[in-house]
Amino acid sequence: MTRPDDWHLHLRDGPELAAVAAFTARAFARAVVMPNLKPPVATVDAARRYRERILAALPAGTAFEPLMTLYLTERMDPAEVYRAAQSGFVVGIKCYPAGSTTHSDAGVTSLDHCRAVLERMEERDVVLQLHGEATGNDVDPYDRESIFIERELLPLVRRHPRLHRRYRPAVAGR
């Protein structure tokens, strides 16, 4: 395999975008692009514009396919799931718990607040990608992932059994 896929890529935006996109495209044929920019890539239209900026930043003749994701927010319109499923370039919706990582301030405080979107994702077979960390003053930093599994992931699986989820520790060990 001479040019594999990168399944978790942060390209950022602005000056960093050109450098990281060119470097990535030399080694990888495709990459799943994370949506945690400022502002977040939360709509298909925003993902389309970001994808265009990525492609424009590549050297001429570069063969590289950015696979776009949307940033799940508690205000996301469930109709956005339908647009994502029909887009041909959005491969999933990424959930960042609020305050868990870089640019996660627009993230969700609980997946319970996103039920309508998650129901549409289940119906349309859209992948939910999880940044699986619990946040809050009651959470020990060393227990963030295990508490996320207990408080968010396991209830999510019970409520939405057909929802496609991607979370490495949960897949590997639970």
Go through each PLM region and give its residues.
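Short, acidic/polar
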Residues: G14-F23, R75-Q86
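Histidine/acidic residue-rich metal-binding segments in metalloenzymes
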Residues: A79-C95, T101-R174
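Short helix-capping segments at alpha-helix termini
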Residues: A56-A63, R158-H160
